[in-house]
Swiss-Prot record:
Gene: hrcA
Repressor as UniProt keyword: yes
Protein name, UniProt field: Heat-inducible transcription repressor HrcA
Transmembrane spans: none
BP GO annotations: negative regulation of DNA-templated transcription
Length: 338
């Protein structure tokens, strides 16, 4: 549809605008090394690109800026992968180098690091715990009255909580109970644990622990964990540093949406596998109509576990963000396989 010359001019306009946030005129383009056409030719091609809807005028400048259609064409047809700096690759890989892979900790740190590397808002939707399977459970005494119950799932999710240990339960009973739980419950989906414990495990415990009723109370406290996905944000206020959002009235609804968090559950929960780019009004939420959302899913085999997303202005560094998300999802997937 577009000529080679138009493709080059469109890509140069978008690349320049992404970097400068300033409308791009023919004089700016004429100074670019890769543009060898006359100013008159550049103006004619820009007029054609505007007529086709790929670029548009602003009220305050004679230059042009990319339209949503222009950004979509750029992402679909002109984008080239960006090679990330080695120090950033090392920083990201170091995050996933720990031998014990705690999914919750990784999700929190991923959101923070991505927000720092991009200066956009990063969102990580963790796995839905109800679809996880129990890997093992530990109960670690802190003193005579309290202990920490630690639940580890097959996806690396670690859930810990402090529980009360009745005086009537001795440490040997606690150890027996943990051994029985790991023997009988390893591999059981988290959503089925409650039924399995109170229909099967309690019967087994009767023959092994002295104070049966107190042991049941410990069990009940240990496995009361939220099963829905957790969502983590990094750089919630980063949008305010973008020139497009210096008008607080313009960005107020977006900041409210980010602060409330809940709307992003529905947005991220149903993402298709792989990298997805939503630009401007392609986003379902009206508060995001001046934003782009780039998301990537991570999984083990056929099982999709979670989503990482970057929210920024439509003038986003698409190539860099996509390269970062691809690296993060590879690292998370590899970490979950450990």
């Amino acid at each position: 549809m577009l000529t080679e010359r138009q493709l080059l001019i469109l890509q140069t306009i978008i690349d320049d605008f992404i970097g400068s946030a300033q409308p791009v005129g023919s004089r700016t383009l004429a100074k670019k090394d890769e543009i060898t056409f006359s100013s008159a030719t550049i103006r004619n091609e820009m007029a054609d690109l505007e007529e086709l809807g790929f670029i548009e005028k602003t009220h305050s400048s004679s230059g042009r800026v990319p339209s949503e259609k222009g950004y979509r064409f750029y992402v679909d047809h002109l984008l080239a992968p960006q090679n990330l700096p080695n120090d950033e690759i090392v920083q990201i890989k170091d995050l996933f180098a720990e031998r014990i892979f705690e999914a919750e900790k990784i999700a929190q740190q991923s959101a923070q690091i991505l927000s720092e590397l991009t200066n956009y808002t990063a969102i990580v939707l963790g796995p839905k715990l109800s679809t996880n399977k129990l890997k093992n459970v530990q109960i670690v005494p802190l003193d005579r009255q309290t202990a920490v119950a630690i639940i580890v799932t097959d996806t690396g999710h670690v859930q810990s909580k402090t529980i009360t240990v009745p005086e009537s339960v001795d440490l040997s009973d606690l150890e027996k109970m943990v051994n029985i739980l790991n023997e009988k419950l390893s591999g059981v989906p988290m959503s089925e644990l409650h039924n399995k414990i109170f229909k099967e495990i309690v019967t087994v415990l009767r023959g092994y622990v002295h104070n049966y009723d107190s042991a049941i109370k410990i069990l009940d406290g240990t496995f009361q964990v939220p099963l829905s996905e957790k969502i983590y944000f990094g750089g919630k206020a980063n949008m305010l540093s973008q020139p497009e959002f210096h008008d607080i009235q313009k960005v107020r609804s977006l900041l409210t949406m980010i602060d409330n968090e809940a709307e992003f559950y529905d947005i991220l929960r149903h993402k298709q596998v792989g990298i997805q780019v939503k630009i401007g009004r392609e986003n379902s939420a009206t508060a995001m109509e001046d934003c782009s959302l780039i998301s990537a899913t991570y999984s083990i085999g056929e099982e999709q576990l979670g989503t990482i997303a970057i929210l920024g202005p439509t003038r986003m560094q698409y190539s860099r963000v996509i390269s970062l998300l691809q690296l993060f999802t590879r690292q998370i997937t590899d970490g979950l396989k450990k």
